[in-house]
Amino acid sequence: MTTAAEHYEHHLAPVYVWMAGGTEAALRAGSAEIDALNLPVTRGDVVLDLGAGFGMHSIPLARRGARVTAIDFSTELLATLKELSGDLPVQAINDDLLAFQSHITEEPSAILCMGDTITHLPELSAVERLIEMASAELPSGGLLIISFRDYSVPLIGEQRFIPVRNDETRILTCFLEYEAETVLVHDILYERTSDNWLTRVSHYRKLRLSPEHLITSLQSNGFNVRREAGMRGMVRLVAQSV
């Protein structure tokens, strides 16, 4: 079975910025989400962005004066982040999400794990570990913000086919295959050549996390939790350390 890291390296990373709507549109969307969160981050505060990708949230945060540690397993997406962030205070780190504690040198005021990143973890116990580690690192009043897709209730029939994006040269469609604790995500990419269409297919597993389970886990680790609607139909949990 292809891992999430392998899936991104060989399939999604080369088209990820396009998939997100293009650089400018994606950064505008990330900036709008940061505005909606109204984070109490002041200039010089340290923020961790887990699963930062090409910087959709890291760059808007850095533009607001935060010092961002951006962690991701994709070297290609991090290279794009470095190019886009320029001289902004963003440190790009290629590592596993669960290794984020080893990259903390100053107390963070917020930890972000957004864009369905948390469902890429290999098992539910890894999600619990991430929450426990975040609780240990954040000060009283610090924020852990998680956004993810709720796969706990399966889609049926043709609902499992999800158009992601298309233009005159590319078509990306996602197909979901539900298992007991995970969903098998098939990303089907068609790309036009000079005289034909090429098809590439890859799949990987995501966790079927329910909002209720995550809220309970966050609360048991000393967070007050607010649930709200996130971008593109995602669930967003804003957890504040007590």
Which role fits each region the language model picked out?
Residues 128-140:
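A short glycine-rich, Lys/Arg-flanked "PGG" loop and its adjoining helix->strand segment in the class I
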